[in-house]
Amino acid sequence: MLWSIVRTRPLLRRRLYRLPFAADQRATLVNVKLKWVKDRALDSVVARERHLRQVHRLLELISTDPRGGVPIQELLIRPLHLGNLRVLPSDFLLRFPALFRRSSAISSGRSSPRIFLTDDAFQLRELELSVLRDSEPELVDRLRRLLMLAANFSLPLQTVDQLSWDMGLPSDYHKKILQCYPHFFGLVRPDDDERVWLKLSAWDPLLAVSELQRSSSAGGFNGNSLSFPVRFTRGFGLRRKCMLWLQEWQTLPYTSPYADPSDLDPRTDVSEKRIVGVFHELLHLTLGKKTERSNLSNLRKPLRLPYKFTKVFERHPGIFYLSQKLGVQTVVLREAYGGGRELLRKHPLVSIRERYAAMMNTGRPEICRRHLISEESEVVSSEVCYKN
């Protein structure tokens, strides 16, 4: 194998073996001209989750209230931010009659309106909690692998919070996971940083195998020049120069995202392949194999990436797709969808979230439904030259 694990104190750390390609790197990063082409299938994957996270947050709040329902007056002080709009939760929830219902209770001799879950929503929430309990060991391993990608096996807790929804972690994972697994996780505050960091307490070499290595090994290939699955949007025309470059780039040595990259020259295609590998692995750690680009913006130092590292998303449109839906850029791993709108391998939590999304569209006034599924203005495809 390219990488070996060696023991240090108090943890195990990674060390790069000096192979011929590592000693003879050249600044070979090629300027290529690529164009962004709209992928309607993957855009629909992003668009169908409009407002899902906000709805789920309020659903959790109501389901955990010991009174069974939350008084509307309490919701009035918690405005939601939906893009550029600030919406009162009570008004927002009543858009989804299949999930929420309004009822009045007598309190202190007067009527007090409250928001409750519908019976169907309550049953689905109970099923979700059951799946979360069953999936807990796997979710713990996902979080451990995320930290193993980072230098010193630690990330700012705020960064983990931003990724927690995409990774399927429960909203109270600080309590349900971090406190319940002290032998894996610890909170630290570095001397030169005011932020709280989440640190992995123990390195596990069994987890330090990337998804690409697993799939390649299952296919009978055990070399070090692993190729990424590539799939382009229908109608995407790859110029000959770009095609030749991509073919050569795929044959370059593959650097595990869990390995120490300090000996790699950031000006080389070998280093760029390592960056692609890091985000390929990170997206595989998410449930939907996607995340907002903004969630990755503060990962440069922890993941030991060069400046302008996110340009790999534009340079490799056959591996990643940048969706512009919902007013944000979302990075989607193409291979996970196989050219369609559905994940090839679907986690049970994804299926539950899809049922929530379907219930959000049930029983709504037609004008609201049309507004929910209306597409944003088309973004014109353009050719852009990405320079080193």
What residue spans do the PLM features occupy?
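Long amphipathic alpha-helical repeat/alpha-solenoid cores
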Residues: 2-388
